[in-house]
């Protein structure tokens, strides 16, 4: 059976993607924030220990929380960079796509 992992698959567009894949009999793991936090590389690596192979991978996590630009700190920028780039790169380098 074809397997899929949908990050951000518990609501919104990700949930719609998950439901669409399920409707064509694909075995879907819909990952939520509690399953993986792409801004935290320890969380990403822990996720990859369990979910290290799939046929389909959808990278659909949410973005940073809204905040006035003037209030964004260097720490925030590092978190956003991890969340939307480094976390995804780590996943892509370490997961086997069949």
Task: Describe the residue ranges of each PLM region.
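Rossmann-fold scaffold of SDR-type NAD(P)-dependent oxidoreductases
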Residues: 7, 54-62, 84
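N-terminal Rossmann NAD(P)H-binding glycine-rich loop of SDR-like oxidoreductase domains
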Residues: 10, 14-19
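Flexible cofactor-recognition loop at the NAD(P)H-binding site
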Residues: 11, 62-65
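Rossmann-fold cofactor-recognition segment
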Residues: 31-42
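Conserved amphipathic alpha-helix within the SDR
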Residues: 41-54
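Hydrophobic positions on the long internal alpha-helix
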Residues: 58, 87-95
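Catalytic Tyr-X3-Lys loop
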Residues: 63, 70-90
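A short helix-coil junction within the Rossmann-fold of NAD(P)-dependent oxidoreductases
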Residues: 67-68, 93-98
